[in-house]
Amino acid sequence: MLHQMKLKSAPFHKIKSGSKTIELRLNDKKRQQVQVGDFIEFSMLNDTSQKLTVCVTALHHFDSFAELYAALPKEKIGYASNITPDPGHMDAYYPREKQEKHGVLGIEIRLTYLQKFVDAQEHGYSFGENYETALSEMKQRQKISHWIWYVFPQIQGLGISGATAYFSIKDLNEAKDYYAHPVLGARLIEITEELLKFQTDDPMTVFGYPDAYKVRSCMTLFKYAAPEQELFQKVLDKFCRGVEDDKTVDVLGV
């Protein structure tokens, strides 16, 4: 599941820099829906165009923020080692009555680098088009505009262009995150399914060079990131005679 939450500038930048890995919230009805493995998209209160995506790795339940502060490492909450947190600090934001009613929650998180893919698919990137354009072109059976980097991403190290490098997936774990992300994973499946509907089995006639090779790299990557999903191998079978991209396999070390 993907949750949307807002943050003030200071905690937003602490999470972005990696100096804060536990977000504190009242355990109200909305927060009770959060589960380990879910994703949270944080947007900054005073600039909602600034966003980042994290994955939930653990949930810490307490009766009050004072208990939470006493139990969890202050560095994970975002305090420097030479700072002593005030146990009553959160009372100004969440009165004691609400803490007693709902309980409180420490959401332990891991920063991902998926937000750039979400942003590019929503709004385009530089001269590249958005996901809806990409899907429309695949339904019309011909790639016309530019969007390949963030719709069919490759493993890091295969390309030297700015966009290729920027939108590269750094390793197998990040590919698994991408596939598990409720928006990115669903879109990857949706647009990949369109490829199987093509009458042609020649990727060059659809994507041209070098994008046809990028699609093969992408299919190879996600074949290993999501081995339970047969879709990616089916595309390799259709367009590449079942042959994986050797360079992707080498980088993955599989």
Regions found by a protein language model. Name each.
Residues L59-Y69:
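Short, solvent-exposed beta-strand-terminating loops
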Residues Q50-H61:
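Short beta-strand-centered aromatic/proline hotspots
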Residues M44-S49, V151:
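Short, charged beta-turn/beta-strand-edge "cap" motif at the junction between a beta-strand
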Residues I189-V254:
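A charged, amphipathic interaction segment
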Residues G37-L45:
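Short conserved beta-strand and strand-loop elements enriched in small hydrophobics
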Residues M1-V36, L111:
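Compositionally biased, charged N-terminal/linker segments
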Residues Q35, T112-Y213:
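Conserved, aromatic- and glycine-enriched, well-ordered alpha/beta core segments
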Residues E67-T112:
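Contiguous surface segments at macromolecular interaction interfaces
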